[in-house]
Amino acid sequence: MLDEVLAELDPKPGEVVCDCTLGGAGHSIALAQRIAPDGLSIGIDQDDMALKAATERFSREAPRAEFLPLKGNFGDLDQLLVGARVPGVDCFLFDLGVSSPQLDIPERGFSYNEDAPLDMRMDSGKDTPTAQEVINTYNEADLTRILRVYGDEKYAARIARAIVETRGKAPIETTFQLVDVIKRAIPAAARRHGGHPARKTFQALRIEVNHELD
């Protein structure tokens, strides 16, 4: 994947590159090494931990490159670049998904393989609805919509109905509680194929919570 990115973007010394989904900074480091020493590598992420880790990684692995970390959502790309007084960018990189460090911290609630509170906020310090709030407050139609649109979930309506029925008895508060609801909603035959049955639902919730496609 990295080789394909480098071949497609073909960064050159002195250029300005912007990684709009910084995450673990692996792609940014590789790009920065190509544009050093006079280029500028910009990294955007909502997660304070990701920005801090990337800054430290740049100092170790790309010390000759100039790195500008910007906290925010790539949906606000124009405002972020104007606010940082960046005159122009030669190439942009978007890698939609969750970085490994985020998955490695169970309490962030991104992983369906670890039991944790349903949070999923990339910026955990931001006062925005968590996945738990989405699951327990959205009506059935809205839940169906986000599962279908953001997760391409074939059984979106069945899962949404099961969520509403379950939360009517008690709130759904943890990742494993939600996984259990999803497994019960999906036909047994479907659970045996296509990866983890909760994968698409968790993806859809993450996108909704963080407004990734706004």
What residue spans do the PLM features occupy?
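S-adenosyl-L-methionine-dependent methyltransferase catalytic core, i.e., the SAM/SAH-binding region
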Residues: M1-D214
